[in-house]
């Protein structure tokens, strides 16, 4: 009876010690879970590569998507960071860079290896690590060291492109034609890149013949935009805020709208609709978009002569519920020169490229989609890491919680599938999409201008990084630069253009009040440098104080338990 009592007492002490450890871990903290975190995980865009970049294709994945310079894989295996605290494996998008293309020496490719006795018509990009051009009998080919063999397959379904095969001897050089058959894809490698560039050149030629070029008089050249926003970008911001105000007014009345610096890649929302065969739409160069995961939607297939057709590619991220074939004869009805989507829509085809219209004699598989800007949202209640005490005291920046626009707008799976019964009319989203389609080229130019300003400013403030966080605050107050994004403040009335200037004035006032404080200037000015040491010092003292007590308690409990078992 005494042994049983001692054993229960020992178990109680172990349980109590475990609770103390849990409390200590909780004291140090895992960090708070951001509001809307599950939604953000659900709506992470594939090409954002939330799971990071890996060197090889993941062993366990359910879906893959071409992202231009890399391929995204939706993994679920036991890789690093894939286990979720809620139980089970957390899916995440991991990206693998595509094979490198080695540039030619002085612009002239060398001769092909002697092992290339036969020239393959296709070679998948997963079968080699890097490639370069070579010449044989006056023709240019690709050559690489074969890493593995592979059979051609319909990985994305029988209505999609055939994935190229890999033939040859592993470890030996292989050569293949840079132009693959029109219905074969090398998984986004150099062959697909050449096809995409060829389509762009064909479309440029069509546009050049369709629309006369504008010649500016030397005395009437357009003036540079400078640091101010052009009307197109302002329209995108205002339209986005209007839609956000209609769907989520609480968030819209106090928030930051953040645009990614560099080339914008809008998000595509697959929809169903009716295309028109009147050709009354403008044709422009395709632009990249960021699609969601796999979804069921109607598809459009273009059939034409392989020799004269324009291969726009085959969409990968969707399952076709139905396929409407647009043959060459159909597209020539009424002297039609292009296939037009409904207003506010685009065609999304191969390599995630969006087309405002499809030219005559196009070849491929496309879907209809609306697009929303590449904009993230920061709640106005989120503390923005302005360069005040944080940087004066040499503290690290706080992580800013960005909310994807799809989450902020409340676009659900029902919306993506074309469902009805939405709180806000789908017409509202299409209106925003139409605005973005019209201004996508100008939008790219404006954001690139802002990127140039960051680069110029970075050279000036290379030793004072705080300047990057108030970009253009002293140059007109355009936006706040946070984590490679350009953020604009908005309230219920719209975009507030003087917000950055007000923040700058408030920051100067706070710094002046801080430096005027005698405590701050104490210790001959060493106090700002001592503050960063207080946190680690306090943690060390706490560990040295509680550590021996915890270890002593655990040792005594284990010793008592062993003695109880022996007796």
From Swiss-Prot:
Which ranges does the record mark as transmembrane?
526-546
Q: Tell me yes or no: is Signal among this UniProt entry's keywords.
A: yes
PTM annotation: Specific enzymatic cleavages in vivo yield mature proteins. Envelope glycoproteins are synthesized as an inactive precursor that is N-glycosylated and processed likely by host cell furin or by a furin-like protease in the Golgi to yield the mature SU and TM proteins. The cleavage site between SU and TM requires the minimal sequence [KR]-X-[KR]-R.
So which residues are the signal peptide here? 1-35
Cleavage, annotated site positions: 398-399
**Segments of this protein annotated with the region Immunosuppression:** 462-478
List the CDD domains: HTLV-1-like_HR1-HR2
Residue ranges, Extracellular compartment?
36-525
Q: Where would I look for the motif CX6CC in this sequence?
A: 479-487
List the record's Gene Ontology CC terms alphabetically.
host cell plasma membrane; membrane; viral envelope; virion membrane
> Where does motif CXXC map?
255-258
> Which PANTHER family does the record match to this protein?
ENDOGENOUS RETROVIRUS GROUP S71 MEMBER 1 ENV POLYPROTEIN, VIRAL ENVELOPE PROTEIN
Its job = The surface protein (SU) attaches the virus to the host cell by binding to its receptor. This interaction triggers the refolding of the transmembrane protein (TM) and is thought to activate its fusogenic potential by unmasking its fusion peptide. Fusion occurs at the host cell plasma membrane. The transmembrane protein (TM) acts as a class I viral fusion protein. Under the current model, the protein has at least 3 conformational states: pre-fusion native state, pre-hairpin intermediate state, and post-fusion hairpin state. During viral and target cell membrane fusion, the coiled coil regions (heptad repeats) assume a trimer-of-hairpins structure, positioning the fusion peptide in close proximity to the C-terminal region of the ectodomain. The formation of this structure appears to drive apposition and subsequent fusion of viral and target cell membranes.
**Protein name per the record:** Envelope glycoprotein
Organism of derivation: Avian spleen necrosis virus
Taxonomic lineage of this organism? Viruses, Riboviria, Pararnavirae, Artverviricota, Revtraviricetes
Q: Which gene encodes it?
A: env
